[in-house]
């Protein structure tokens, strides 16, 4: 063996020895086992602590990011409907757990499930997540303290009223000061009502043919432009009229459907009030981009949001699907709108572009008359209102004869927080 060959051999041997020592390091494998246990426990706590719609949102958000990523190889891991594995520094995770505790570790794991890449998780990011968790805990403590103070205040007011009532009953006859005491009690009562009324939002206002509850009206500057295709507007009509129009139409999938089928489909398709949210400036907080594709000669875009539909004493969780194409002026036209009941196990199909494209309507008549979303008004006799809250948007359909009776309720949930 020449000196040169010997040198190469020794370098290879030294490298193999170092790599072997790394692979068979007991300390390293103990550390990995500890990190795996921490991550598995965090996943368990996350999944068990979420409501069904929250878990759907978590899986949909992470799965959507994975699906839209550029494929790096020819493997079919995506078809398994799992999030791809990520490579993350085990020492960093273990140090974060020891320094900040389980809540921060759990949030780090949640962000990984939401699609955070391992290369983006460094010490700076860990500190940032820890700050978010601390702020969240601080707000929670403040809210708890505020609730306790309000409860104590209510008890003190009730006690004060009771003492005054006893004192009043103990007096004999009417005193000259009685009228002033009655006025004082009346003023206190008015103050209490005003304090309670301060927590109630502004009175309902008319928005797009609906009554909208949700504080101050926003300017139209931040609102988005949308048009509604006739095939979407059709579902706002009576079941008999819907069946008549579908039977005369060109879409084979809807021809010949029974009236009972039409009634069932109307429940999940007649949700045009969702456009009030879709047009708002914070629509991206609720809807996630599900990608674009070409079909039937047009480029189509799809958006989905997690929701729940309450009707007939039942509650279904699923996704709100929105399909659009752009007209000649570049304005998005909503040609597909539906609530799709979805289980945890089938969320992969709902967000898979290939499955969606295959099931989408073949051709949409882009020349059909469309209506501006801001001019949409439900047919006479339909009573519904929209209610916008911090983490959700609700559309409530009521009985026109008895508005205390809720016929249907669609709740659209805000997307999970990505740090």
From Swiss-Prot:
Compositional bias per record (Basic and acidic residues), positions renumbered to this chain: 136-165
Regions of compositional bias (Basic residues) in chain numbering: 213-222
InterPro entries given in the database record: DUF3654, UPF0329
Disordered: annotated span: 136-222
Record family assignment: Belongs to the UPF0329 family.
Name of the protein in its database record: UPF0329 protein ECU07_1890/ECU10_0010
Species of provenance: Encephalitozoon cuniculi (strain GB-M1) (Microsporidian parasite)
């Amino acid at each position: 063996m020449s000196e040169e060959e010997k040198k190469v051999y020794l370098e290879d041997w030294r490298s193999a020895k170092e790599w072997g020592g790394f692979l068979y390091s007991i300390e390293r494998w103990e550390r990995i086992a500890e990190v795996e246990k921490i991550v598995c426990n965090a996943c368990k706590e996350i999944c068990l602590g979420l409501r069904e719609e929250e878990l759907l949102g978590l899986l949909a958000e992470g799965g959507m990011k994975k699906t839209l990523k550029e494929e790096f190889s020819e493997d079919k891991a995506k078809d398994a409907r799992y999030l791809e594995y990520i490579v993350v520094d085990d020492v960093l995770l273990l140090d974060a757990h020891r320094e900040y505790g389980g809540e921060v570790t759990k949030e780090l794991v949640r962000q990984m499930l939401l699609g955070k890449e391992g290369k983006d998780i460094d010490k700076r990011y860990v500190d940032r997540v820890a700050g978010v968790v601390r702020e969240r805990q601080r707000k929670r403590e403040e809210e708890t303290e505020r609730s306790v103070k309000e409860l104590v205040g209510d008890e003190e007011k009730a006690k004060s009223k009771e003492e005054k009532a006893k004192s009043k009953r103990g007096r004999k006859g009417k005193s000259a000061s009685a009228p002033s005491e009655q006025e004082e009690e009346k003023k206190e009562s008015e103050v209490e009502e005003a304090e309670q009324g301060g927590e109630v939002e502004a009175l309902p206002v008319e928005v797009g043919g609906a009554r909208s509850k949700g504080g101050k009206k926003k300017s139209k500057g931040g609102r988005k432009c949308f048009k509604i295709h006739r095939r979407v507007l059709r579902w706002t009509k009576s079941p008999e009229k819907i069946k008549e129009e579908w039977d005369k139409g060109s879409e084979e999938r809807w021809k010949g459907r029974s009236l009972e089928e039409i009634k069932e489909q109307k429940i999940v398709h007649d949700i045009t009030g969702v456009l009030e949210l879709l047009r708002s400036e914070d629509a991206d907080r609720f809807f996630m981009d599900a990608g674009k594709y070409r079909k039937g000669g047009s480029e189509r875009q799809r958006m989905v949001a997690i929701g729940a539909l309450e009707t007939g004493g039942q509650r279904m969780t699923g996704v709100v699907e929105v399909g659009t194409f752009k007209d000649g002026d570049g304005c998005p036209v909503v040609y597909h709108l539906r609530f799709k009941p979805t289980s945890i196990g089938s969320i992969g199909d709902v967000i898979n572009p290939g499955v969606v494209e295959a099931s989408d309507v073949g051709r949409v008549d882009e020349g059909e008359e469309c209506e501006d979303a801001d001019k949409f008004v439900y047919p006479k006799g339909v009573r519904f209102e929209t209610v916008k809250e911090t983490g959700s948007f609700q559309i409530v359909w009521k009985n026109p004869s008895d508005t205390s009776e809720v016929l249907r309720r669609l709740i659209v949930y805000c997307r999970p927080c990505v740090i």
